[in-house]
């Protein structure tokens, strides 16, 4: 039987078990997908268990960066991004990948979001790094903003991007919220409505709540919008393919996540 899990802290409300249960069932595979609460200090011990008994695991906060030092091999893309979200176990060896970046691009394509720049990524943390890397690899002009300007400058220098003030949002054709704004406080938005562009698309990686203030205001402006669930589903589907060689239906995984969210 195939064993999978998501490791992170906290993971009690993770949507990954619901998505991967759909993937296993839809492809007729016998297996399980667990949620393992794993604080940072518990990571080495957990990975020993993975070496022994699991086909693969997903990693979420706060483990994506720390895991690199504990793996036998890390893909060049994951090394550049500085984060691993998918681990494959083969004969006791652990191989690390990042499916966040390609998952983001696949979600845009599936949702009919034009890959047109300039693209402004709000946030220079782990999610922001993956998104900025993906958009740059797709050939877009990429701008980055962060509440702490030094972090935006560091990311821009590392990836060959441009750190910009928030006011540049008006000139962007693709806006991506890769911050946690809107998660703890649903009434908050990372961007004042008056700074939204006149045309283009907006993506919010926050999916609790699913329709954030940021997305609602963008939709009212007439912009094309996408919630955080398509990227979540696509990164999960690509991880599942790394583990099994089979690609589950991302739209089915997204629907499973919606049901788990209760929306």
Curated annotation (Swiss-Prot):
GO cellular component: cytosol
E.C. numbers: 1.1.1.25
Binding-site list for NADP(+): 123-127, 146-151, 205, 228
Catalytic reactions of this protein: shikimate + NADP(+) = 3-dehydroshikimate + NADPH + H(+)
Keyword Transit peptide (UniProt): no
Residues the entry annotates as binding shikimate: 14-16, 60, 85, 100, 207
Keywords: Amino-acid biosynthesis, Aromatic amino acid biosynthesis, NADP, Oxidoreductase
Any one biological process term the GO annotation gives: shikimate metabolic process
CDD domains: NAD_bind_Shikimate_DH
Entry-linked Gene3D superfamilies: Leucine Dehydrogenase, chain A, domain 1 (3.40.50.10860), NAD(P)-binding Rossmann-like Domain (3.40.50.720)
InterPro entries assigned to the protein according to its UniProt record, in alphabetical order: Aminoacid_DH-like_N_sf (IPR046346), NAD(P)-bd_dom_sf (IPR036291), SDH_C (IPR041121), Shikimate_DH (IPR011342), Shikimate_DH-bd_N (IPR013708), Shikimate_DH_fam (IPR022893), Shikm_DH/Glu-tRNA_Rdtase (IPR006151)
Pathway assignment: Metabolic intermediate biosynthesis; chorismate biosynthesis; chorismate from D-erythrose 4-phosphate and phosphoenolpyruvate: step 4/7
GO MF term set: NADP binding; shikimate 3-dehydrogenase (NADP+) activity
A family per Pfam: Shikimate_dh_N
Family assignment from sequence similarity: Belongs to the shikimate dehydrogenase family.
Cited function: Involved in the biosynthesis of the chorismate, which leads to the biosynthesis of aromatic amino acids. Catalyzes the reversible NADPH linked reduction of 3-dehydroshikimate (DHSA) to yield shikimate (SA).
HAMAP family: Shikimate_DH_AroE
Subunit structure as annotated in this protein's UniProt entry: Homodimer.
Protein name: Shikimate dehydrogenase (NADP(+))
The species this protein was found in: Thermus thermophilus (strain ATCC BAA-163 / DSM 7039 / HB27)
């Amino acid at each position: 039987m195939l064993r999978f899990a998501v490791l992170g802290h906290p993971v009690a409300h993770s949507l990954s078990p619901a998505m991967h249960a759909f993937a296993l069932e839809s492809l007729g595979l016998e297996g399980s997908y667990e949620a393992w609460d794993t604080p940072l200090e518990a990571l080495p011990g957990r990975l020993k268990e993975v070496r022994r008994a699991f086909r693969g695991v997903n990693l979420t906060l706060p483990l994506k960066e720390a895991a690199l030092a504990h793996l036998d091999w890390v893909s060049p893309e994951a090394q550049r991004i500085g984060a691993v979200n998918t681990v494959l176990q083969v004969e006791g060896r652990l191989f690390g990948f990042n499916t966040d970046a390609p998952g983001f691009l696949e979600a845009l394509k599936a949702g009919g979001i034009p890959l047109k720049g300039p693209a402004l990524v709000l946030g220079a943390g782990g999610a922001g790094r993956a998104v900025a890397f993906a958009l740059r690899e797709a050939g877009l002009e990429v701008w980055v903003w962060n509440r702490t300007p030094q972090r935006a400058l560091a990311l821009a220098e590392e990836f060959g991007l441009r750190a910009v003030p928030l006011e540049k949002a008006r000139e962007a054709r693709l806006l991506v919220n890769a911050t946690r704004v809107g998660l703890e406080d649903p009434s908050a938005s990372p961007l004042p409505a008056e700074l939204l562009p006149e045309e283009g698309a907006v993506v919010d990686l926050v999916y609790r709540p699913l329709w954030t203030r940021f997305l609602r205001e963008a939709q009212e402006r007439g912009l094309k919008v996408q919630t955080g669930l398509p990227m979540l589903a696509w990164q999960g589907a690509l991880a599942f393919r790394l583990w099994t060689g089979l690609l589950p239906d991302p739209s089915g995984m997204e629907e499973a996540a919606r049901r788990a969210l209760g929306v």
